[in-house]
Amino acid sequence: EQLIKKDVXHKDXFAXGSE
């Protein structure tokens, strides 16, 4: 679950960068 939490933070910064 900790990994997912970290991923969310990264996604927030990238937003469309990852997706």
Curated annotation (Swiss-Prot):
Keywords per UniProt: Neurotoxin, Secreted, Toxin
TM helices/strands, residue ranges: none
Expression tissues: Expressed by the venom gland.
Record GO cellular component, one term: extracellular region
Principal subcellular localisation of the protein: secreted
Compartment(s): Secreted
UniProt GO MF annotations: toxin activity
Superkingdom of origin: Eukaryota
Sequence similarity: Belongs to the scolopendra toxin 3 family.
Protein name: Scolopendra 5848.46 Da toxin
Organism this protein belongs to: Scolopendra angulata
